[in-house]
Amino acid sequence: MPINSKQKGARGEREFASLCKEHGFDVRRTQQYCGNTGDASDCVGLPNIHIEVKRVQALNVDKAMAQAIHDSEHKNVMPIVAHRKNNAKWLITMRADDWFEMYKESRLSNGS
């Protein structure tokens, strides 16, 4: 029996939150954390990041990124799409300008 897309989306959000916790970040699904707050982010707990989670086999990256950008407008946060296919690792998609901004602030950019 196939799982419906809402259940699969919720499962993907829990999986991504768990991955974040494995890396030391206290991330939770938005609904589980605070109900319907008007925050369209799928998960919360990474300050200044709008997280759109997609758990699909065939992702339309442009559409998913457009949704993340739209939902993060006027919030001064960086939109990302966290996505994973079956039997694959999680990937993060973000705008190049945002990636360069993060890289400049990281320890990696100074060779440490």
Where are these regions (language model features)?
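Catalytic phosphate/metal-binding cores of nucleic-acid and nucleotide-processing enzymes, i.e., regions
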Residues: 1-112
